[in-house]
UniProtKB/Swiss-Prot annotation:
This is Lipoprotein signal peptidase. GO terms for molecular function: aspartic-type endopeptidase activity. GO terms for cellular component: plasma membrane. Its EC number is 3.4.23.36. Pathway: Protein modification; lipoprotein biosynthesis (signal peptide cleavage). The active site is at D142, D164. Its main location: membrane. The gene is lspA. The keyword Ribonucleoprotein does not apply. It is a multi-pass membrane protein.
Length: 186
């Protein structure tokens, strides 16, 4: 595999890497607090029914699609991260760097979360298989739970986390800052 000509640290500057690390810290620490303070599938109203903290576990892909596919999801996420790093490195002029940083922070947060078995009300341990099903859980911790307008197809938006928020913010930034005509030329 041929490495890009641009030096790595001219694209992934120390300040950008620190931002990704900070986003990763916010994501994993928020998940830790939720997993140690709540029980599985517990829901705590924060702003009435509009916003609740609801502990759920996503063993699938985006928005909980293809549940109970933890290992394929782990490999797919790892592959996506490697792809994003090399794509960003090769195309450093495409999009706003902060958009990429948000996406990377979120991708790393959910990727690392998949390496742990969660024990609600207690903590977590490294591993991929719960020893006590129903008490221990695998998958990404989701806990931000918002009501969705009734005229749409479902009552509540799927629960999400800080990492998911980072990815969404990053994608919006990239959509508004990428030069789509320039991408067509490459």
């Amino acid at each position: 595999m041929k490495l890009p000509k641009t030096p790595f640290f001219s694209v992934f500057k120390p300040g950008y890497l620190a931002f990704v690390a900070f986003g990763l810290f916010l994501d994993l620490s928020s998940k830790y607090v939720i997993i140690t303070k709540m029980y599985a599938h517990e829901s705590i109203p924060v702003l009435g029914d509009f916003f609740r903290l609801s502990l759920t576990f996503n063993t699938g892909f985006v928005f909980g699609l293809f549940q109970d596919n933890a290992l394929p999801s782990l490999f797919a996420t790892g592959f996506a991260i490697v792809f994003l790093i090399f794509y960003r490195w090769e195309n450093s002029d495409l999009g706003n760097a902060w958009g990429w940083n948000f996406v990377m922070a979120g991708a790393f947060g959910n990727f690392l979360d998949k390496f742990f078995v969660k024990i609600p009300g207690s903590g977590f341990r490294f591993g991929f298989t719960p020893e006590k099903p129903g008490i221990e859980f695998i998958g990404v911790v989701d806990f931000l739970d918002f009501e969705w307008p009734d005229f749409l197809l479902f009552d509540r938006w799927p629960a999400f986390n800080v990492a998911d928020s980072c990815v969404s913010i990053g994608i919006v930034i990239l959509l508004f800052t990428m030069d789509w005509k320039e991408m067509d030329k490459k």
